[in-house]
Amino acid sequence: MKKDDRFAELDASGITAECLVETSDGWDGSPLPNYPEGTPVISIYRYVFPPHSVTADHFHKIINCGVVTKGQITLVCANGREKTVMAGEAVVEIDGEVHHGENCGDIPAEVIMFYAGDGKIPFSFPA
């Protein structure tokens, strides 16, 4: 693994860091929104999707991303575009586009999601 100078605490420790994603764009290539004004509030949530479950259609106004830790999740946009994210893969959500998430698998899927907001803007809005 290539040494990354941003992690001084890892020098000579044997600990490694692997970048799963680093981007200014959502998974579809659209630019991410600016951070909200005011004090930042970082939230991390664990979602568990039962087999064959589907979220309601929704959209986001804040930056959010996640890592699938078990199973797989498919993100489906209202316009038909979709992306399947497997266990161990990361995804940066798209801003303002109506979509839903679904677990098409036969086992529960688990996703750890990170939200960068201000504590006032909801994580998602119903479509």
Where are these regions (language model features)?
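A short, N-terminal "cap"/entry segment at the start of jelly-roll beta-barrel domains
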Residues: 1-41, 126-127
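A short beta-loop-beta micro-motif enriched in histidine and acidic residues
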Residues: 37-41, 52-65
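Short beta-strand segments in beta-sandwich/barrel cores
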Residues: 54-55, 71-76, 90
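Short acidic-glycine-tyrosine-enriched beta hairpin
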Residues: 79-96
